[in-house]
Amino acid sequence: MDKVLNREESMELMDLLGLERAAWGNLPLMRKAYLRKCKEFHPDKGGDEDKMKRMNTLYKKMEQDVKVAHQPDFGAWHSSEVPTYGTEEWEAWWSSFNEKWDEDLFCHEDMFQSDEEGTADSQHSTPPKKKRKVEDPKDFPPDLHAFLSQAVFSNRTLACFAVYTTKEKGQILYKKLMEKYSVTFISRHSSHGHNILFFLTPHRHRVSAINNFCQKLCTFSFLICKGVNKEYLLYSTLSRDPYSIVEESIQGGLKEHDFNPEEPEETKQVSWKLITEYALETKCEDVFLLLGMYLEFQHNPEECRKCQKKEQPYHFKFHEKHFANATIFADSKNQKSICQQAVDTVLAKKRVDTLHMTREEMLTERFNHILDKMDIMFGATGSAVLEHYMAGVAWLHCLLPKMDTLIYDFLNCIVFNIPKRRYWLFKGPIDSGKTTLAAGLLDLCGGKALNVNLPMERLTFELGVAIDQFMVVFEDVKGSGAESKDLPSGHGINNLDSLRDYLDGSVKVNLEKKHLNKRTQIFPPGLVTMNEYPLPKTLQARFVKQIDFKPKIYLRKALNNSEFLLEKRILQSGMTLLLLLIWFRPVADFASDIQHRIVQWKERLDSEISMYTFSRMKYNICMGKCILDWAREEESETEDSGHGSSTESQSQCFSQASDTSGSADAPASQTPDPYDHDNPYHICKGFVCFKRPKTPPPK
């Protein structure tokens, strides 16, 4: 061990290892200390880089010299092997014994000449320069960078690659790559004394896979592998100066048309914008409803029955425009995502309108929407009967006195939205018409119905439904302490009493939905319906007006005899209330933007529904009859009295002349059908027949 390092180096190494100098030669202990100090001195661990380098140098030198010292022939000899002193054999043995010491003991005895002693030639001559080693290139030539992929860490797969290596390795890799990847084409090019391999593979590979394969064959030679973005441009550049083609797998090489196949048909993509526009025009906020309606557009509009009937305006008005896009949409894999984005756009548009539009403008827009719907339903292609809806107007007008004024005042309350004067209360027993009128007002203004009879912990998300709504209805609120034992108790009134900030509208409240952030806004105004439950004074003060409903037997009988009002939900429709306002209110009460449309509808109602007809409807309601029995009664009364007009007399004479019996009193089985178009006093469904009966003179 004393011959491994000199004294100064051994002492320095032991100090660096942190061991006592007496431990010199204990190789296992020194090895453990070396590994421990490597972690301590390593620069990445915050150690001293200089100490690390010095310790590595001394330790490696010590290890190398220890290996030489432990060789079998190092200083090993036996007494029997020593020849006789003075012989030639002994001289040879002594020379071999001292061979390993000659290097350490050798010194130059010749003195170097000083500058003064040097000759003139030695002072002015330049020593021969050593031949510098040519450095390996670090990248492809700069003029090729535009055609190569510069991605270093990428999982992208390609089918064209370029390899830059030495001339000797280029010859080997040319054959190895051809065998390994069954290349479609490969060529070898010379470049500044090196080789560039350009090749195409039948399958796509990562650049790292090609590089790893080539690195196995290039242990010492440099290797650069990259993917090719512009195949033909790179190949054509490598075929011209300063490059040249050495060999290639296809005679004549590649041509430009080899990289320009026939252009396939462009894959048509679904237009998300068209679907969003459709959702905005129809104001659809339901993802699955939008998905179902748009899938119906994939059928040919010329063969579509819905388009031929023209009953659904949201279908026949948009079918032809969206047919081509719906055909592509039917094959899409992300239909729900597209519809979800369209619905989100509708909600975003609604939020913007809530922020920037006045409540009067929002109500006017709602009225325009209902008027558009009325134009289609009562138009030439519509299936709705105007008399049915006017019968609903007559029924609602009999529900409460001055119904038109009541609705007008409610709309003013909703539009102005004054704090602590924003809510109405509809109170009354069962089947008194509270919910019917509340549902009609909700459909007229637009909004949501909420259930506050839930437990308080579930009420948070129920209130979140009111986000960005124009109005709300707290429907059928339950309480406790009612006089009637038939009324069940509930948490509704207590919950409403806990929502005073919501009802007042003075401060903004936090509303939240599942999977959405909280929305801070003024809670929308509205009304509350309930049975005869007692109210605390704190809650009673939140209602600006209370309307007490009472059941009316004649209204119930008329409703039971007029089933079309229930089947078509005419009484709960906002169109019925709008027709009521058009019939009773002056044009000046409406917004100026829609007054011209109100005038048109007033003229139409005057031409189709006379005051006498409307009076007969109200008379039948008061009598508990079918509301549309006025036509049948007029026919029978005209036959009995004989005071009909000339047209009526002619039709009566015509019917009598066609009667084979010739008697004046027709049997009950031959009573004219009020729905027969040949009867001048028929009830016309739609606009198939334009024969309108003349209004009989007042009796």
Swiss-Prot record:
Q: What does this protein do?
A: Isoform large T antigen is a key early protein essential for both driving viral replication and inducing cellular transformation. Plays a role in viral genome replication by driving entry of quiescent cells into the cell cycle and by autoregulating the synthesis of viral early mRNA. Displays highly oncogenic activities by corrupting the host cellular checkpoint mechanisms that guard cell division and the transcription, replication, and repair of DNA. Participates in the modulation of cellular gene expression preceeding viral DNA replication.
Chief place where the protein resides = host cell
Occurrences of domain SF3 helicase (ranges): 402-562
In this chain, the stretch annotated as Disordered covers 115-137, 637-678
GO BP terms: namely: DNA replication; symbiont-mediated perturbation of host cell cycle G1/S transition checkpoint; symbiont-mediated suppression of host innate immune response; symbiont-mediated suppression of host JAK-STAT cascade via inhibition of JAK1 activity; symbiont-mediated suppression of host type I interferon-mediated signaling pathway
Residues bound to Zn(2+) are: C304, C307, H315, H319
- Which amino acid positions bind ATP, per UniProt? G428, P429, I430, D431, S432, G433, K434, T435
> Where are the Phosphothreonine residues found in this chain?
T126, T695
**What is this enzyme's catalytic activity, as reactions?**
Couples ATP hydrolysis with the unwinding of duplex DNA by translocating in the 3'-5' direction; ATP + H2O = ADP + phosphate + H(+)
| Organism this protein belongs to | Simian virus 12 (strain wt100)
- Report the residue ranges where the short sequence motif Nuclear localization signal is annotated in this entry: 127-134
Q: Where in the cell is it found?
A: Host nucleus
Sequence positions bearing Phosphoserine: S114, S122, S125, S661
Report biased composition (Polar residues) as residue ranges: 643-672
The note describing how and how many cofactors are bound reads:
DNA helicase activity requires Mg(2+).
Recall the taxonomic lineage recorded for the source organism. Answer: Viruses, Monodnaviria, Shotokuvirae, Cossaviricota, Papovaviricetes
Summarize which parts of the chain are annotated to bind DNA, as ranges.
141-256
InterPro entries for the chain: DnaJ_domain, Helicase_SF3_DNA-vir, J_dom_sf, Lg_T_Ag_polyomavir, Lg_T_Ag_Polyomavir_C, P-loop_NTPase, T_Ag_DNA-bd, Znf_lg_T-Ag_D1-typ
Q: Which SMART domains match?
A: DnaJ
One term under GO cellular component: host cell nucleus
Annotated J domain ranges read 12-75
* Superkingdom classification of source: Viruses
Q: Name one GO molecular function term.
A: zinc ion binding
Name of the protein in question: Large T antigen
Q: Which cofactor does it need?
A: Mg(2+)
